Amino acid sequence: MTNYKELFSWTLLEEIGNAYTHGIRIKTPVTVALPPKKLETTLDLDDSIIKFYNQTSRLELAWELTDTPENTEPFQKNQFIIENYLKKDYSWSFVKELLSGYINITASDVVFDKEYNESQTFTYTLNKLNITDHFFAFDIQSSVTACFKKTDNHVPDIIWLIHTDADQVYDMKIGLEEYLNLAYQSKCFKNWQLVYLFGKKAAEYELMKQFIPLIFKHIETDLSAFDINTNKKH
């Protein structure tokens, strides 16, 4: 298994920091990568889940554009942003949040804790949809949560996505490793999960297509899994 603790807390963090080499400043208000702790659960977990939590007990990384006039000017004057957001009365702070990245992997001591999961927003979505299956939050975002799902006493390595505004729960048809690889490839771009599932139908598709290669143009980005070609120079 890839060392995901190192991939996010070292490799991605370095890539974020080096955006300054082409004039883009990014800040990382949250960076957490804790040593591993034993998973406290009687559930039968797939080996890949155990192997991941043997690397780290908690992983969190947030990045956003540094909000200074000289740093944000190229984005605020971008024609796509002007036409699709600013002219439609969306604030710059709203747009800036869309142009950010976040991964928030649940800590090992609560990932399979019943009370913890019942207190999360995704539970209200399940109740609204009258879904009684047991889900466990793996990556908690503001509007989407990537989860594992229990079958009897077994938790297979299959990622499900719960969107606060959706009318169903989505089987992403990927496991933990592919999920984390996709998160890295997208630089944890906000709602990358929706782009992966729905492609061009997702509102975030065009944002990812235009701005990940721009923000990270100091490195080779691979967004092919999202049906985005980044081979051309930016």
Task: Place the predicted regions along the sequence by residue.
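Coil-to-beta-strand transition motifs
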Residues: 142-144, 152-157
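Compact, glycine/acidic-enriched structural inserts
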Residues: 158-191
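Charge-dense, low-complexity intrinsically disordered regions
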Residues: 182, 193-234
